[in-house]
Amino acid sequence: MLFSKVIAPAFILLGAASAAPGGLAPENASKRDQPSVGDAFDKYNEAVRVFTQLSSAANCDWAACLSSLSASSAACIAAVGELGLDVPLDLACAATATSSATEACKGCLW
């Protein structure tokens, strides 16, 4: 029953779309209009470089900050696992993160 009502029409539609003249790509599209993987990688590297410059300009030591926030990791991992369904657990995560943030996070978080 499922094959005749869903799967067979899906295969017919797929066959008709792939047999369409010119395919489904717009006629005026060219390779030049599509971003390449190299361009995306260059943009990613530029974003990382800018982030690194900004964090170093703010005297942020990410390694020290993350190690100081490790005390709140258990509460926050549990809160993320609940996907926002347990509000008290979310509040506990926020409370432990703000209380365990030390001077190491001064340039990173505030």
Swiss-Prot record:
Thermal activity profile: Thermostable up to 53 degrees Celsius.
Tagged with keyword Hydrolase: no
Cofactor info, note text: Binds 1 Ca(2+) ion per monomer.
Keywords: Calcium, Disulfide bond, Glycoprotein, Secreted, Signal
Secretion signal span: 1-32
Post-translational modification: May be glycosylated.
Source taxon at top rank: Eukaryota
Disulfide-linked positions: C60-C108, C65-C105, C76-C93
Transmembrane segments: none
Cofactor requirement: Ca(2+)
UniProt-listed InterPro entries: CBP
Annotated function: Involved in calcium binding and uptake in yeast phase. Required for growth in limiting calcium conditions and for yeast survival in host macrophages. Is able to bind a variety of lipids.
Assembly: Homodimer.
Protein name stated in the entry: Calcium-binding protein
Organism: Ajellomyces capsulatus (strain G186AR / H82 / ATCC MYA-2454 / RMSCC 2432)
Chain's gene name: CBP1
